[in-house]
Amino acid sequence: MPKRTGDILMSSPLSKFRRKLNFDSPYTSRAAAPTVQGIKRRSWTYRPMYRKPRMYRMYRSPDVPFGCEGPCKVQSYEQRDDVKHTGVVRCVSDVTRGSGITHRVGKRFCIKSIYILGKIWMDENIKKQNHTNQVMFFLVRDRRPYGTSPMDFGQVFNMFDNEPSTATVKNDLRDRYQVMRKFHATVVGGPSGMKEQCLLKRFFKVNTHVVYNHQEQAKYENHTENALLLYMACTHASNPVYATLKIRIYFYDAVTN
């Protein structure tokens, strides 16, 4: 008689009970009776890839973007910006052409994800004033880059009463600029309830396929398709804030380079 495995449910038409032969805690799944389908679905989770069925080995999650090849490369940008009411912009897809782990091999690569880490803070004079200031962040994809530098915040976004919190992409630029992610952070000044700095820690999946020209330098003017831009603006008209950020992009080189 063949032996039964430990995680098989034994039940028969004549029996009025079901048993589960494993040594799990009785409090994990006490509410509902487990099914064979649920156990089979979880049984391959913590096994190595060569011991999983063929379906799990063939149809995997898209770790590497379509049309790209490994290894995963990393490029970091350390910057300190004076964020004003009129806004500031930084290009976060500047990658130099080369053979290193931080370089692109050819013209094409795909930015799979971006990691924004840092803080926004006020100086000694501004944090003593009673006010609340919010910094708006817009992660924008420029599908057709043009010129030597990115367009300013006021040129890209349409605002009511010059308020960055009401910023939307202008109608004639909606096919070129796409807001992929939008978030904000708040600082408060004053003698009571002061919050002079706010930490930032954001991770986004973007899957942006960037195309350069034949130049090697990491510049905005060398982009031909899909430049990734980070726009920042504060809501207070007279009190600026400072942003100390470390931005990391994780990208893969394209196969067709």
UniProtKB/Swiss-Prot annotation:
This is Capsid protein. A motif (Nuclear localization signal) lies at residues 40-54. It comes from the Viruses. GO terms for molecular function: DNA binding; structural molecule activity; zinc ion binding. Keywords: Capsid protein, DNA-binding, Host nucleus, Metal-binding, T=1 icosahedral capsid protein, Viral penetration into host nucleus, Virion, Virus entry into host cell, Zinc, Zinc-finger. A motif (Nuclear export signal) lies at residues 101-122. Belongs to the geminiviridae capsid protein family. Encapsidates the viral genome into characteristic twinned ('geminate') particles. Binds the genomic viral ssDNA and shuttles it into and out of the cell nucleus. Plays a role in protection of the genome from degradation, virus acquisition and transmission by insect vectors, infectivity, and systemic movement. The CP of monopartite geminiviruses is absolutely essential for virus movement. Homomultimer. Binds to single-stranded and double-stranded viral DNA. Interacts (via nuclear localization signals) with host importin alpha-1a. It comes from Tomato yellow leaf curl Sardinia virus (isolate Spain-2). A zinc finger (unnamed) spans 68-85. GO terms for biological process: symbiont entry into host cell; viral penetration into host nucleus. A motif (Bipartite nuclear localization signal) lies at residues 3-20, 201-248. It is found in: Virion; Host nucleus. One of its GO terms (cellular component) is host cell nucleus.
